Amino acid sequence: MRHTAAVGGFDVDVVVVGSGFGGGVAALRHAQAGRSVVVLEQGRRIAREDMEAGGRNLRRLLWAPEAGLSGYFRQSVLRHVVVVHGVGVGGGSLVYAAVLLRPKPEAWTAPGWTATGVDWAGELDPHYAEAATRLGVETNPYTGAQDRWLASAAEDLGVRQTFAPTPQGISFDDCVRCGACLSGCVHGAKNSVDRTYLDAAERLGAVVAPRSKVRRLQRLRGGGWLLLVVD
């Protein structure tokens, strides 16, 4: 549904809160549809020097405002899982290893999926293909000692067929194999959302507003929403 939301003293058709994978895709699709778009991100734009500093110093890497830390890597420790977040323009894509696996065909035949009556493979395959193109997926051409260990472990467990090269959103011509994907790629090899979806959206007129945290949403009587945003 299309609404008008007041942001920063002006009206836009669409406000996207968060600039990670979901926010990046939403921003681009609405911009392609000709709508005016603002993307609100509580973190800042992360430059190469920020990533270099984060790779050397945890205080420059971690996001924990309550402790005075304003990096871009955040962890939430829950009861059964630890969640890693990226806080910056690009969201979680800043701090992931760019591994982009697709579900195997048999995943869609599991009872929980077939019960819906939807042809999930047919529905989702075109979107997986579009995302793979946009994120520049390539198969990792490199192997090393760790790969050999994994292959050996898979062999011992009787699942050797599950070991294979990994598809990743990385330009391997630019990759130096430093292994620092999770603290940000300083070499520009990782195709993070800020360099793909958001870049394309901005070229179409979308505005990305860093350091913008949404505190409150208010539905307007005449339609649309008012957002209270703080720096």
Predicted regions and their residues:
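N-terminal glycine-rich phosphate/pyrophosphate-binding loop and immediately adjacent elements
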Residues: M1-A110, V229
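Short low-complexity, flexible loop/linker segments enriched in glycine and/or proline
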Residues: E52-R56, C178-L182, G223-L226
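Conserved beta-strand-loop-beta-strand element in the redox core of flavoprotein oxidoreductases
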Residues: R216-D231
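Short Asp/Glu-rich motifs
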Residues: E49-D50, E106, D174-C175, L220-R221
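Secondary-structure transition/capping motifs at alpha-helix termini
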Residues: R35-S36, E202-A209, Q218-G222
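Conserved redox-cofactor binding core of oxidoreductases
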Residues: G112-V214
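Short, solvent-exposed loop/turn segments at the edges of secondary structure
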Residues: V87-G90, V176, G222
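Generic recognition of flexible, low-complexity loop/linker segments
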Residues: T4, V25-L28, T196-L198, K213-R216
